[in-house]
C-alpha cells in the first residue's frame, strides 16, 4: 500500500513527476488526469515533529516568513535593526575593513524556537499534532495553489484510542483531501467508495465486487443493503481478515455475526480476496440457501 501511495504522490508533482511511467485515469469519463491537477504531500508524525526545528525548507518557516512579509510594519523593524547593526559595527575599534550581514526575515527564523510549557498538555503528542498539523497543511495548500492533497501514514502511531478519535477529527476538518494508510479502524472511511484494501497491489474493494455479491447472493438482499453492511463490517473486522479468522453466529470468535446478510457479505469478501477462514456456524440459525452457499 505504501508503494502505491508513493507512486500516487510522486505523480502529482510539478517537477520530477513519474507521469511518463504512471497513468492515472478518471473512471467517470476514462480520461487521463494531468499530473498538474493536484499536488501531493506525504506526512507522518515524524514529519510534523520535525517542523518544530524550523528548518529553512519547513512549511512552518515558509508560513512565518510569508505572514511577516504581509505585515507592513515588519519592514520598518528590520530597517531599524540594520541601522543599529551598522552603528554597532562603526563603534568597533580598529582599522580592519569589516562589514556586517544585513538582517532579514530568514535571520529572524534562525532566532526563533518553540517554547512549549511541558507542564501543560504540550508534553502529549496529540496536543502538538492538533496545534501544528492545520498550520502545516494550510501552508502546503498555499504552496500548491489550492490544489494540495495529503497522504498521512499511520496516524494512529503513538496515540491512544481517544486521541485517535481526536486526531481523526483534525484530519476531517482539513480543507483538502486526505488519504490515510492505517491499521486502526478509527481512521477508516465510513463510505464504501472511501475504503481501500489491497492484496498484491490490487484493489479488492470495487464496484465489481459489490455487483457480483448482489447478483450471486443466495438470499434476498438489496444492493444498497450489501453496500451499507459491508461498510460497517469492514471497518469493524478488517484487522482480523488476514489471520484465518473464525466466524461464528453463536459463540465468541474473531468475527461474530447473527444474521444471514452479514454472514454472506463477510464470506463473499473473504472468498473474493482468496483469504482463509474457518466457520463455526449453528446451521439451525441460518437459511437453507445460505447454508448451501457456505458449505457446498
Give residue ranges: language-model regions.
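Structural motif
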Residues: 1-2, 151-157, 181-184
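C-terminal alpha-helical "lid" subdomain
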Residues: 227-296
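Short, charged, amphipathic alpha-helix that recurs within catalytic cores of restriction-modification
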Residues: 153, 168-169
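A generic secondary-structure signal
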Residues: 7, 138-139, 169-170
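Conserved helicase/translocase P-loop NTPase motor core
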Residues: 110-163
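Glycine-rich P-loop/Walker A and Walker A-like loops and their local beta1-loop-alpha1 context
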Residues: 1-58, 271-296
Amino acid at each position: 500500500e505504501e508503494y502505491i501511495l508513493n507512486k500516487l504522490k510522486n505523480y502529482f508533482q510539478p517537477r520530477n513527476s513519474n507521469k511518463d511511467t504512471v497513468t492515472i485515469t478518471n473512471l467517470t469519463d476514462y480520461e487521463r488526469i494531468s499530473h498538474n491537477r493536484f499536488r501531493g504531500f506525504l506526512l507522518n508524525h515524524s514529519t510534523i515533529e520535525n517542523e518544530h526545528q524550523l528548518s529553512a525548507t519547513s512549511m512552518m518557516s515558509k508560513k512565518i516568513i510569508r505572514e511577516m512579509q504581509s505585515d507592513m510594519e515588519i519592514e520598518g523593524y528590520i530597517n531599524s535593526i540594520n541601522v543599529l547593526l551598522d552603528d554597532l559595527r562603526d563603534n568597533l575599534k580598529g582599522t580592519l575593513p569589516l562589514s556586517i550581514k544585513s538582517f532579514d526575515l530568514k535571520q529572524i527564523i534562525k532566532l526563533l524556537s518553540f517554547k512549549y510549557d511541558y507542564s501543560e498538555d504540550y508534553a502529549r503528542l496529540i496536543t502538538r499534532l492538533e496545534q501544528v498539523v492545520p498550520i502545516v497543511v494550510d501552508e502546503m495548500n498555499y504552496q500548491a495553489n489550492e490544489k494540495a492533497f495529503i497522504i498521512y501514514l499511520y496516524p494512529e502511531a503513538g496515540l491512544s484510542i481517544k486521541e485517535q478519535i481526536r486526531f481523526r477529527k483534525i484530519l476531517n476538518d482539513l480543507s483538502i483531501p486526505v488519504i490515510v494508510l492505517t491499521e486502526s479502524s478509527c481512521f477508516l472511511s465510513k463510505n464504501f467508495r472511501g475504503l481501500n484494501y489491497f492484496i498484491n497491489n490490487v484493489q479488492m474493494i470495487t464496484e465489481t465486487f459489490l455487483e457480483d455479491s448482489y447478483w450471486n447472493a443466495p438470499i434476498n438482499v438489496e444492493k444498497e443493503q450489501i453496500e451499507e453492511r459491508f461498510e460497517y463490517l469492514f471497518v469493524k473486522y478488517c484487522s482480523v481478515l488476514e489471520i484465518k479468522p473464525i466466524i461464528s453466529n453463536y459463540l465468541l470468535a474473531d468475527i461474530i455475526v447473527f444474521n444471514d446478510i452479514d454472514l454472506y457479505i463477510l464470506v463473499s469478501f473473504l472468498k473474493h480476496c482468496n483469504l482463509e477462514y474457518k466457520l463455526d456456524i449453528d446451521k439451525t440459525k441460518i437459511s437453507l440457501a445460505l447454508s448451501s452457499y457456505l458449505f457446498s
